[in-house]
A protein has these predicted regions:
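Signature of extracytoplasmic/envelope-associated structural regions
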Residues: 1-318
C-alpha cells in the first residue's frame, strides 16, 4: 500500500523574490511554522454548451489559474517578522534598548514584496511552489480564555508548480517562542483599557488580482496593491460610557495592542481611529459587555502611516 502524506510531516518554506513571479536562485529560505496551510492552485473546468447532434457533452474548456489561500500561523517572537515584511515591506531596524535586542518598525509603503512559498510533503516526495505570492489580509484576535494565539494571512499568488524535491535545500529555522493571550494588553486613547476582553485587528492590503491577460498563459502576471485598510473591534466590560461616547460623537481616538514576553514585544499601533456606534444589548442575567467596531485612517498623525507595527526581538535583520 502506498504511503499517505501526513500533515505533521509537511513543511512550509518561504523566500522573498527579487523579481515578481520568479523563484529566487539565491537568498535565504525560511522554514515557517504553521497551524494550517490552505494555499492551493485551482483551475476551473468550463461547461461546454456545444451541440454536436449527440446527447453526450463535449470537452470542457479550461479556466484561469487561481493560486491563493489562507495560512494560519502561531503568533511568535521571531517568525512573525517575515510575515510583517511580506505585509508591509522591509522594516526600519535599530538597536533595542535591552542588550542583544533589535527594534523593527513596519509601516505602510507604496509597494509590498512578493514571495515564493513552498508547501511540501516530504514523506511522499511532493512539493508545490507558489511564485509571485503577496499577502492580502492579516487578521489577529487577542482574547481571554484558554486559546492558542494564532493569526491568519490571506494570500494571492501568480502560479503553482509541482516538483519532486524541495527548492529550499537548507532553510533557516528561527526558534519558535510564542506570544500568548496572557501577554496581551490594550490601550485606547493612550490609556490602558483594563476592561478589554477581546480585540480583533484586520489589516487589508486590498490586492487586485484581476490582472489576467491574453498572453498565452492562465496565470497572473502581476498583483497590484490597493488602499491599506485597518478595521476590527474591541469588546469590553460595560462599566461606563467612555468609549460609547466617543463612538456616538465620532471622536477620534487611538488603539494599541501589545504583546510582551521577557525582553521581546510586538506592538500594533493605530494612531487615528473612529469607533462605530453600537449600544450594548441585554442577553441574560450575567454581566453586560459592549462590542464596538473600529476603523483606522490616516489624516495627520506624525507617524505618517495608518498603522505602525513595532517588533522587538533578537533577530538582527529581516
Amino acid at each position: 500500500m502506498a504511503k499517505q502524506a501526513k500533515g505533521m510531516k509537511s513543511i512550509t518554506n518561504l523566500a522573498f523574490e527579487k523579481t515578481y513571479g520568479q523563484m529566487p536562485s539565491d537568498g535565504t529560505w525560511y522554514q515557517q511554522p504553521i497551524n494550517k496551510n490552505a494555499l492551493t492552485g485551482k483551475q476551473s473546468l468550463i461547461q461546454s454548451n456545444t451541440i454536436t447532434g449527440r446527447r453526450d457533452m463535449t470537452e470542457p474548456g479550461i479556466g484561469q489559474m487561481d493560486a491563493s489561500g489562507q495560512l494560519e500561523l502561531p503568533l511568535d517572537v521571531r517568525n512573525i517578522g517575515n510575515i510583517l515584511k511580506g505585509l508591509f515591506g522591509a522594516p526600519t531596524t535599530t538597536a533595542g534598548t535591552k542588550e542583544g535586542t533589535y527594534k523593527h518598525v513596519f509601516k505602510v509603503t507604496d509597494e509590498i514584496p512578493s514571495l515564493t512559498i513552498e508547501k511540501g510533503f516530504p514523506d511522499i516526495g511532493l512539493f508545490f511552489t507558489y511564485t509571485g505570492t503577496k499577502f492580502n489580509k492579516f487578521s489577529l484576535t487577542a482574547q481571554v480564555g484558554n486559546n492558542e494565539t494564532t493569526y491568519t494571512v490571506d494570500t494571492m499568488a501568480s502560479n503553482e508548480t509541482e516538483a519532486k524535491k524541495t527548492a529550499a535545500t537548507a532553510p533557516t529555522a528561527l526558534k519558535l517562542t510564542r506570544f500568548n493571550n496572557v501577554n496581551a494588553s490594550v490601550k485606547e486613547g493612550g490609556t490602558a483599557l483594563a476592561t478589554c476582553r477581546k480585540m480583533q485587528l484586520d489589516i487589508n492590503n486590498n490586492l487586485d488580482g484581476d490582472t489576467y491577460c491574453l498572453n498565452g498563459s492562465s496565470i497572473r502576471p502581476s498583483i497590484n496593491e490597493g488602499m491599506s485598510e485597518i478595521t476590527g473591534n474591541i469588546e469590553t466590560l460595560f462599566e461606563d460610557d467612555a468609549q460609547l461616547q466617543k463612538a456616538m460623537n465620532s471622536t477620534e481616538t487611538s488603539l494599541e495592542l501589545e504583546f510582551t514576553r521577557d525582553n521581546f514585544s510586538l506592538t500594533f499601533s493605530v494612531p487615528e481611529v473612529i469607533l462605530e456606534r453600537a449600544t450594548p444589548g441585554i442577553s441574560g442575567p450575567k454581566g453586560i459587555t459592549q462590542t464596538l467596531n473600529f476603523r483606522g485612517y490616516y489624516a495627520d498623525d506624525t507617524g505618517n502611516s495608518i498603522i505602525t507595527v513595532t517588533l522587538i526581538n533578537d533577530v538582527a535583520t529581516y
